[in-house]
């Protein structure tokens, strides 16, 4: 059984509802290129944009399927229609990660074609699934798909690189509209950097329209997260400077702010329930990342009342080394 991290629906809704509400309409099924067909999951909403994108990949009679939607009957009807009208079948089912809007259609597909039970792949597989290794290749006629381990949005998240198109199926790491969320911000930002280094031009996201300029989108994502993290650090640095200024030379106290105080310093008057349900997940992950980076510390105790503080920068001193009985600096 795969290790799973908590999934905060309210946090998703806070992020996505704040983005452009006028999303472009997407067809239920679309032939995007000669080797990629997109089938919408039939589950539009604040969390899923126009719905979960699922993709049939390849050019021959046997295709790779990436993700399976939420498990709604309308999706099964759509994909069966595509399979039958094109006289094609599914060779592999590749799941980007464990969230139900990506894995929910697996049982329906197996009911439709029981032989598919032996061909379901996921990183950190659940019972009955086969593992996906970083760098593993899945190939059918017209398509070579390479798995790329990109955790952060979820502990098991995989992207898939389509070599023939220099395109990347980005899963939930990068969306077609707005920004995604990440319970593990540090690993997520590392994954974004890794995705950028792949050099893919096109992005096929799990939600939203095709990304025509993936490098620019990744740069935007990385900059957005860095600005959020830097904003939190700036608030804590100002608090430390305020405390030290008030206490003068005796200002040994670090200064500190609770999660709620940080949120209000950044966003103004915000109700406690909004902070707890919508802002706390990102703030906590950003604070832990800053802690891992050595820029922020905290006082042990009740997480709600815990004080976070900016770590003072240490003045660098010349390094000292001994040479032939003398002491030199450099």
UniProtKB/Swiss-Prot annotation:
Pathway: Secondary metabolite biosynthesis. GO terms for biological process: secondary metabolite biosynthetic process. Zn(2+) 1 binds at residues 97, 99. It comes from the Eukaryota. Zn(2+) 2 binds at residues 101-102. Pfam families: Lactamase_B. Its cofactor is Zn(2+). Its EC number is 3.1.-.-. Keywords: Hydrolase, Metal-binding, Zinc. One of its GO terms (molecular function) is metal ion binding. Lactamase-like protein; part of the gene cluster that mediates the biosynthesis of neosartoricin, a prenylated anthracenone that exhibits T-cell antiproliferative activity, suggestive of a physiological role as an immunosuppressive agent. The non-reducing polyketide synthase nscA probably synthesizes and cyclizes the decaketide backbone. The hydrolase nscB then mediates the product release through hydrolysis followed by spontaneous decarboxylation. The prenyltransferase nscD catalyzes the addition of the dimethylallyl group to the aromatic C5. Belongs to the metallo-beta-lactamase superfamily. This is Lactamase-like protein nscB. It comes from Aspergillus fumigatus (strain ATCC MYA-4609 / CBS 101355 / FGSC A1100 / Af293) (Neosartorya fumigata). The gene is nscB.
């Amino acid at each position: 059984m795969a290790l799973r991290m908590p999934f905060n629906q309210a946090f998703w809704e806070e992020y996505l509802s704040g983005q452009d509400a006028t999303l472009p309409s997407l067809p239920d099924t679309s032939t995007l290129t000669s080797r990629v067909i997109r089938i919408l999951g039939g589950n539009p909403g604040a969390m899923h944009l126009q719905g979960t994108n699922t993709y049939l990949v390849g050019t021959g009679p046997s295709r790779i399927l990436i993700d399976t939607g939420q498990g709604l009957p309308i999706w099964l009807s759509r994909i069966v229609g595509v399979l039958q009208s094109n006289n094609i079948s599914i060779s592999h089912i590749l799941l980007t990660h464990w969230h139900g809007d990506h894995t929910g259609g697996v049982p329906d597909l197996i009911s439709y074609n029981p032989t598919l039970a032996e061909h379901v792949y996921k990183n950190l597989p659940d019972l009955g699934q086969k593992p996906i290794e970083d760098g593993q290749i899945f190939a059918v006629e017209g398509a070579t798909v390479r798995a790329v381990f990109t955790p952060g949005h979820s502990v098991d998240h995989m992207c898939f690189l389509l070599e023939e198109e220099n395109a990347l199926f980005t899963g939930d790491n990068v969306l077609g509209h707005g920004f995604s969320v990440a319970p593990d911000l540090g690993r997520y930002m590392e994954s974004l950097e890794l995705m950028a280094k792949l050099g893919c031009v096109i992005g096929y996201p799990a939600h939203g329209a095709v990304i025509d300029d993936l490098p620019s989108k990744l740069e935007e994502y990385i900059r957005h997260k860095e600005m959020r993290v830097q904003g939190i650090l700036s608030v804590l640095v100002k608090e430390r400077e305020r405390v030290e200024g008030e206490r003068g030379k005796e200002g040994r106290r670090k200064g500190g702010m609770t999660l709620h105080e940080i949120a209000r310093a950044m966003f103004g008057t915000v109700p406690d329930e909004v902070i707890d349900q919508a802002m706390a997940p990102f703030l906590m992950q950003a604070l832990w990342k800053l802690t891992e980076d050595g820029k922020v510390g905290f006082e042990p105790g009740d997480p709600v009342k815990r004080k976070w503080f900016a770590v003072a920068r240490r003045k660098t001193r010349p390094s000292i080394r001994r040479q032939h009985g003398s002491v030199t600096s450099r």
